[in-house]
Structures are given as C-alpha cells and as structure tokens.
Amino acid sequence: MKVADVPQDLKYYKGAVVRDQNYAVDDEGRYHMVKSDGWEPKNEALALALQDDKDKEERSHMRVQPTTDFQGFELDLRHQPAAHCENGAIATLLSYYGIHLSEPMIFGLASGLFFVHLPFVKMSGMPVTAFRTFPGILFKRITKLLGIKTVTKRFLSKERAMKMLDKVVLEEQKPVGCVVGMYDLPYLPPEYRFRFNGHNICITGKNEVTGDYCVLDSNATQKVTISRDDLIKVRFATGGTYPLLGQMYWIKSVPEQLPDLKPLILKSIHKTCRNMTSQPDFIPWAGANGIRHLSQSIREWEQKKSSRKAKQNLAQVIRMLEEIGTGGAGFRFIYGAFLQEAAEKTGLTILNDYAMRITEIGDMWREFAYKASRIIKKRKGENYTYDELGDLLQIISEKERQFFKDLDHTNESKRSSTGFEIL
C-alpha cells in the first residue's frame, strides 16, 4: 500500500476503514500517514470554538516548541501515531513488553465504544457528549483481560508525583502513562490546545542534566520533549473538565503466556453490546438511549438558547464526534476495523458484515456532522434545521440499538457453537 494511493473521499481501502483525515489503516491493521487539508465540518467546528474561546487572546501569543533530538536516558520505544490518545498510550506500554496489538483491537477488546450525553456536566461551558467509555477504563479493562498486573497512582504532592515518575522510568526502567491537560502542552499547535484534562502521553526517558523528559504522544508527529516545569503543570492541570492529581499508570508485570484472544474478543463484543442497549429508561443519557436523548434536546436548543449558543453546542458535539481522537464518526470507523480484525482472528467471517454495518452508521454520523456544520455556517441555499438534525439522530439511535442487539445475538450463537465462554 502506498500512502499516496489512499483516496480521501472513500471510507474503505482494500476492505479496511480509512480511519481519519490524517491517517489510514491498511488491511493488515497498519497505520499510514495521509496528506490532507482536513475535513470541513471538523475545521468549521474548531474555528467557531476558537473564535469564542475565552483563552483566545492568550492563545494568540502561544508558540510551538521546536522539536529537538532528545539527549539522555531513553527506553527503546518508537513513536507511533494513533487515532485516540489512550489507545496509543496503551499500545506503547504493551509494545515495550513485546505485546503488539493494533489500535482497533485494543479499543475493541477494552469495549471502548459507547455514547453518553450529559447536559449537567460542562466542558468549556457546554454539555459533554462522549462516544467512548470514560478515561482510564480502556487501560484497566484490557490489562485485566490479558492477565497483566498494573499500577495506577494519583498524588496531592507535585514533588512526590515527579519522584515516583523518575523512580519508575529511571530505576525500574519502565515506560509510564500520564494523564495530562492539553492546554499547556508546549509541543502542540495553539489551535489544538484546549482545556481538556484527559489526554494520555507516555514518558519514556529523562535528561538528568536539563530535567527534560522524553514523551511519546500519539497526537504528535514524532518523539517530543517536555521540561520538568511544563510536565508538572500539565499533570496537575486545573480548569477544564476536572482538576488532575498527577495520575500515572504503568505495567508491573505480564504473564509468561497471554490468554487466547478468541474468547476475549467475543466477551468484549458482548460487553459493548450490553453497554449500548441495556441502559434503563430512567438513565436517558447513555447508550442508544443517550443518542435519542440528544435527538430530543437538540430540537430545543435554538428556542431555549440564543442562536449563537445553539451553534456553540453543535460545534461541541462535532468536535467530540470528529476531533477528539475518535478516528472519525465517534469511534464507529475504528470499531468497524476491530470487527474486521476480529473476524480474521476468530474465523467468524460474519463479523465482516457487521463491520460494514457499523461503518455505514458511521457515515450517518458524518452526515450529521456535515449538516450541523452547515447550520453553523449558514451558507446560501443550505437550509438545514435543528429538527432535521434531531430526526437524523433518532434514526441513528434506532439503527445503533438494532445493530448491537443483532451483533450480540450473533455473537452469543457463535459462542455457543464454538464453546467460547462469555462471562
């Protein structure tokens, strides 16, 4: 596969999902950089968010830290891009121990796909909409499935947090995942720095003379460095979604032999299906119920809020759908890639049909993003309405509910016929 051959307007390439406007995954699960100017709705949502950002003035004076070759102690790990930061951090930690799993497989095994719309939880003053499970759950789930022992720490003391980081990286010589705030990461372009305190990076080395740390960040294009002061600032970021407490996590030990992936794949598919369809009606914010709840709420935004505020809410949903590391369409394309790989590893070729179905649902999410961006722009001759968006979300909700019910039924019947046990 040649990178230049990947067409930007197609969702598939040789049977695999083109996961993002910046990367593509080939039919062997390998990711490749793809040159692109970006996808328009995503860019328009970002432009609106930046225009109204209270940090606009400060952001205008930000400069990107130049990339330099790291000098100092460094673990033998290569940088690899990923659609989502937690997937990327997990892949890096696992690879250090010789465990090489693709990003879709990590995401699928951890039952990462989800939906939640929380009008009572705010990010940048607007309701939080998420298309995946809550931060930290992916690492916890996949390591438990694989029988890997891990450690997670949080701190009140910044000094203790940095001493523990140095101990694990320098003395134990293990890579460490850190949860950080994005706003003060010096190597990111200013337009991609916002007050989101849930980004995952890996620390893989330290220069004990300068105090700089070597960082593997799947959002960056290569290995980067960060100063001790900047690392403290992002590990204990305030504002944004919630204050951080220097959270760090690492692998303590791995079993001599990993378990067979086949039953784990089926178990994970079952868990994802249950998460999306078994939410009770009195919890209207999660799973397929949550999509329906958003479809109802979105119709009221223009009447109950100002036109400007309604557009900002739309932009927030688009950003969470397309920009926040989802690989496109709220992780639906990545989940399609997982089902393709699952079909190969389990021999259940029918999962390829489900991969196509979830990717087609992903196309509907992209249609939603496109129409929402047209409302934001209000271009001549384009008269999409909030009611139309609500109708589309209602259809998506019904399709996802049916998709996951069908997938769970197929998964259960195949498990029974093959003898795989789902716990």
Q: Which sequence ranges carry the predicted segments?
A:
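Charged, long alpha-helical assembly modules
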Residues: 316-423
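Short helix-capping/linker segments at secondary-structure and domain boundaries
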Residues: 95-104, 339-346
